[in-house]
Regions:
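Acidic, low-complexity intrinsically disordered segments
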Residues: 2, 7-213
Length: 213
């Protein structure tokens, strides 16, 4: 493995996709909460930090919190031309999330579109077969799966080397790589709070007992 893309820094967009306004996708029961509570995209933030540690140009976008529409997200993606787009999913929003993936693939067809989250982890093959524009699914903890995938894409490597990845081959077959072991050294992960500071607006988030958590 290598720490940086060989020729130039590869762009990666990590997206909490647009759905209902203020949809809190990262909480235990994803929903629009009457109190207005909306959680930070913590899992995407960890993956963003890991990518940055490895030398990639990672951009974390939280569309529901920031109020970004799908056209706004497509404009952002068009401007950055990422090689990898990581899209968070949830069961209530999965059809919408796949629609967003399809729209992004139409905007930047060269991008590898990867779905992450509990729903696609539980149903990787069914999720891939929802739409041919979805290139892959990261199963389980995806912090290092996303990093390893970015490294393989940047270096023209073999997707078979990426643990925890399910992906579609050129002929449409679905391949499930071996599972990735759970992360043992959690202290090696970057602080999510620093990722929030670099990429998000604290005023976009709310927790009823702490205002801006």
């Amino acid at each position: 493995m290598w720490d940086r893309p060989s020729d130039q820094v590869m762009n990666v967009v990590l997206l909490n996709p647009p759905f209902h306004p203020r949809y809190s996708r990262s909480q235990r029961s994803p929903a629009v909460i009457k109190s207005g509570v909306i959680y930070y995209p913590i899992w995407l933030a960890y993956a963003t930090g890991v990518l940055e540690q490895s030398g990639f140009d990672a951009q974390l976008v939280d569309a529901p919190a920031a109020g970004h529409s799908l056209p706004a997200v497509l404009d952002l993606v068009e401007a950055s031309r990422p090689r990898l787009v990581v899209i968070d999913t949830s069961t209530p929003s999965i059809h919408n999330d796949v629609d967003v993936a399809r729209a992004i693939k139409g905007q930047v067809p060269e991008a590898f579109v990867l779905l992450v989250g509990p729903h696609v982890s539980a149903l990787p093959e069914a999720s891939l077969r929802m739409d041919a524009t979805v290139d892959g699914v990261a199963r389980g903890e995806y912090d290092h799966t996303v990093r390893d995938l970015a490294q393989q894409l940047a270096g023209g490597g073999d997707l078979k080397a990426v643990l925890g990845l399910s992906y579609r081959t050129g002929d449409g077959a679905v391949v499930h790589n071996p599972d990735r072991p759970p992360i043992e050294d959690l202290d090696a992960l970057p602080f999510a709070s620093q990722v929030y500071r670099r990429h998000l607006r604290i005023e976009d988030y709310f927790y009823s007992i702490a205002r801006y958590p």
